Amino acid sequence: DQLPWAPRIDLWYNSNSMRGTLPPKFRKHATLDEIADDIGGAYYKVVPDFINVRSYEDNIDRGIGVYRVQGMSYKAELVGVERVVKKEGEATLVTYLTPIGSVSCKLLYTEDMKQGGVSIPWISEHVIKEPNDYKTVGYIFKNMKVHPDYSNYLDFQRNVGDKGIAVTFGNSAGSPMHHIMKDFLDATTFYYEMYDHPKEMRELCEDMEPYFDQIFRILADSPAEVIFLGANYDEMITYPPFFRDHIMPHLQKLAGMLHPRGKLLLCHCDGENKGLLDLIPESGMDIAEAVCPQPMTKVTISEVKKALKKGKVTIFGGVPSVAFLEDSMSDEEFEHFMKNLFREIVPGDRFILGVSDTTPPDAKFERLLRINEMVQQWGQLPMKF
C-alpha cells in the first residue's frame, strides 16, 4: 500500500487554460483530468465543478447558497417563489418574489476573476439587507422542495471511475446558522446581526431546518460513499463556541445518519484550525479535508495528527499552496519543507496527501511532479522515513 496523493489543481487549471499558459507539453485544450493523469496520484473530486454548468439553473441561486451542479445527489426546487434574473454588465441581479415580500442579491463574475481561475461568482450584494428580509428568505427555504438526483451523481461517479473517490456535494455550510453566515450576510455584518436581531436570525434558522432535513435524508440514502458538508471552518470566523453550538450538532446529526449506512462525512477545513482541534474529533466528521499547516497557519501536521487521532479523523491535505510558489519557497526550501512533512506524516495511517487549499495559478508545475516522485519514493505504508 502507498500513501494516497490527490492534488487539487482546478484553480491552477482554470486560470492557466483561460490565459493560455498551460505547460508547453499539454495541448491548448487539455482537460483537467488529462493533466491530473500526467501528474500522477488520484483524481481530486471533492469540491464540485462550478464552471462547467449544464444550464444557468446550476448556479443561479448561488446568492442563497443553493446549487444544482454536476455530481450532486439532490436537486432543490423553488416553490411559491418567482425568480427574476437581470444581467448588469459583469454582474447578475437575482430577485426572489414571494407572497410576503421580495429579496434580491447580486452576483459578480468578472474577467479578472476568470483569469485568476475563480470558479464561483462573488456575492457583491447580499440577500439580507434589512430585518424584514429574514422572513422572506425564511419563506423561500421553508417552502423549498428537495428531490433525489441520484442519476446526476452516478454519472459523475462513472466518470471518476477507479481514479479517485467521487465525493457528493451536500452543502457548503454545515448548518442553517453557518449558511446564513456564508451566504446571506458578509462576515462582519453577520456578527452585528447576531447581536442586533437574534430573534429574526433564530426564526430563520428554524425556517431552514426542513431544507436541511430533506438534504440529509437524501444524502443518507444516496449511492455516494463520501458526503461533503460544510466548508471554510476557521478559529476566528467560526470561533470555537460558535462551531460547537451552531455547526457541530448538524454535523453530528448527519454523521449519525451516514455511519450506520457505511458512509463517511467529509468537511472542507481550509482555515486556521488551531482553536478547533479539540472539537473536530467530536464533530462526527470522518475526513478533515484541505487541512493547512505552517507557514500558512499556526499548526503543524504533527499537532493536527495528535488532536484528530482521538476521533479517528482522516487528514486530507498537508501541502500549503505557498509551497508551489517560487517567490514563497525556493527549490531548496521546497525540498526541505516536503521532507519534513513526510517525516511528520509517518507512519501514514489516516492521511491523504493533498494541497491546502488548492494549487495556485502561478504554481511551479514541476513541484507537483516532484511530490508524486516523493510519494513513490517514500510513501510505502507503513512509512519509515
Regions found by a protein language model. Give the residues of each.
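Active-site loop segments of alpha/beta catalytic cores
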Residues: D1-F26, A30, K106, V127-F385
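Generic detection of intrinsically disordered/low-complexity segments and helix-coil linkers/edges
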Residues: A6, G20, D37-D38, F50, ...
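Segments that shape or occlude catalytic/ligand-binding pockets
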Residues: M18-A76
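Intrinsically disordered, low-complexity N-terminal regions enriched in serine/proline/glycine
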Residues: A42-Y43, S55, V66, T95, ...
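Compositionally biased, low-complexity repeat tracts
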Residues: N16, N59-D61, Y67, A76, ...
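Glycine-rich, aromatic-flanked loop segments that form ligand/cofactor-binding clefts
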Residues: P4-I9, Y43-S55, G71-P121, K145-F184, ...
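Residue-level preference for well-ordered alpha-helical positions
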Residues: A36-D37, L97, K305
